[in-house]
Amino acid sequence: MNIHEYQAKAVLAKYGVPVPSGHAAFTPEEAVAKAKELGGPVWVVKAQIHAGGRGKAGGVKVVKSLDDVKKEATRLIGSTLVTHQTGPDGKEVNRLYIEDGSSISRELYLSILVDRATSRVSFIVSTEGGMDIEEVAKKTPEKILSFSVDPASGISGFHGRKVAYALGLEGDQVKQGVALIEKLYKAFVTEDMSMLEINPLVVTGEGNLLCLDAKVNFDSNALYRHKDIVELRDLTEEDPAEVEASKYDLNYIKLDGKIGCMVNGAGLAMATMDIIKLYGSEPANFLDVGGGATKEKVTAAFKIILSDPSVEGILVNIFGGIMRCDIIAEGVIAAAKEVSLSVPLVVRLEGTNVDLGKKIMAESGLPIISADNLADAAEKIVKAVKEAA
C-alpha cells in the first residue's frame, strides 16, 4: 500500500527523522492559510500523487510570496500531472503539501527495501540524489552503492557509519547520519514497510541532514497490524478495479493486453500470461483468485475482468487442489449469465472434481470452450479472439 509524501513524513517524524515543517492543503485558499502558518519567506508547493517524477512534470514549485502560493495551488489542484511513472493518462491532483523552503548544500539519495534474493533489508545510497537519480542508475551505476542488514542481528552503529561514509558525510554529519540510519531502520521494520525512499536527502546550508522527500510502500500482508496506516489509504489514487478486487481478497493487476485471465496461484497466473504471449497475444490482467474461492468470489472476479473495456476474451485456468473445479464452474456460469457475456471464454480445469466441473459447464447452455491443457487453452483463446474481431 502506498501513501502520500506528507503522510510518509508524518510517519517518519514519529521516529525522530528530520523533515521540514509542512501542511496538507485541498484548496488554494487553504494552501495560502497553511503557508501563513509556516511563516515563510520561502515555501515549496508540492502536488500529492502516488507517483515519482513530480518535479520534472511541474508538480513541485518553490515560491517566495503568498500570491505565488495561491497561483501555483490554483494551477495544480484539479490538474492532471503526467510523469514517467503515471503513464500517458497521468494522475489528477486533489491535494497539495505546503512546506517550508530549505537551503540546500548537497543532494543525496537513500532508500531501504526488502531484498527478496538475500532475505535481508538493504540500504541503497548515492551521492547523486535529486530528480535525475534514474539517469544516474542508467549511466553511472557505480555511483549507487548498497549494504544489507541481517534481520537477526538488526541495525548497528557500523551500518550507519558505512552509509555515512558512502554518502561523503564528514564531521558532525557522520553522527547525524548514524542516528538517521537507525531511526529510518526502526521506522521501516516497526511499520512493516517494504520500501522507503528518501530522495533527496539533503545537507542544508547549516550542515544538517534533512529528508526533503519521502516515498513509502507498506507490506499489504501486514496491514492488519497497523490500523492507523490503513486509515491513510487514498482510494482515489488506485485503480478502481484493483480497489474492488481487494474487497474480495483477489489479487488483481491491470495490464495492457486484450485477453483477461482468471487463475488460482501466482505461479500459474504468470505461466498463463507467458503462454498467452507465446501464442501471439497479450494478457489484459493478472488475477489470482487464491486457493479458497467461493462462487461469489469467482463471480466478482469475472465482473472485474469484464469491467476493462479492452478485454476481448477470457481464459480461466484453474488447478483444483483446495479449490474444487465444480465451484469454479458454477461461479463462471453465474458470472457469464449475470454480465451477459459477449466475448469468447475458454476454461481449462484440472484437479478436484474436474469431471463434475466440466459436466456443469457442458450442460450450462453457454458457449464455453473447454481446454484439456494450458497450451490448448492459450491456443484456443487466441484463435477465438482473432475470429471474433
From Swiss-Prot:
Give, as in the UniProt entry, the pathway in which the protein acts.
Carbohydrate metabolism; tricarboxylic acid cycle; succinate from succinyl-CoA (ligase route): step 1/1
Q: What is its EC number?
A: 6.2.1.5
- GO annotation, biological process: succinyl-CoA metabolic process; tricarboxylic acid cycle
Record-annotated residues binding Mg(2+)? Answer: N199, D213
Domain ATP-grasp as annotated: residue spans:
9-244
- Function as written in the Swiss-Prot or TrEMBL entry: Succinyl-CoA synthetase functions in the citric acid cycle (TCA), coupling the hydrolysis of succinyl-CoA to the synthesis of either ATP or GTP and thus represents the only step of substrate-level phosphorylation in the TCA. The beta subunit provides nucleotide specificity of the enzyme and binds the substrate succinate, while the binding sites for coenzyme A and phosphate are found in the alpha subunit.
> HAMAP family attached here?
Succ_CoA_beta
- Keyword Metal-binding recorded: yes
Molecular function terms, GO-annotated: ATP binding; magnesium ion binding; succinate-CoA ligase (ADP-forming) activity; succinate-CoA ligase (GDP-forming) activity
Q: Which family does it belong to?
A: Belongs to the succinate/malate CoA ligase beta subunit family.
| Protein known as | Succinate--CoA ligase [ADP-forming] subunit beta
The top of its lineage is: Bacteria, Pseudomonadati, Pseudomonadota, Alphaproteobacteria, Hyphomicrobiales
Give, as one word, the top-level EC class.
ligase
Subunit comment? Heterotetramer of two alpha and two beta subunits.
Q: Which cofactor does it need?
A: Mg(2+)
- One Pfam family matching this protein: Ligase_CoA
| Cofactor-binding details, from the entry | Binds 1 Mg(2+) ion per subunit.
Q: Which InterPro entries match?
A: ATP-grasp, ATP-grasp_succ-CoA_synth-type, ATP_grasp_subdomain_1, SUCC_ACL_C, Succ_CoA_ligase-like_bsu, Succinyl-CoA_synth-like
Keyword field? ATP-binding, Ligase, Magnesium, Metal-binding, Nucleotide-binding, Tricarboxylic acid cycle
What's its catalytic activity? succinate + ATP + CoA = succinyl-CoA + ADP + phosphate; GTP + succinate + CoA = succinyl-CoA + GDP + phosphate
State where ATP binds.
Answer: K46, G53, R54, G55, E99, S102, E107
* Superkingdom per UniProt: Bacteria
| GO cellular component: a single term | succinate-CoA ligase complex
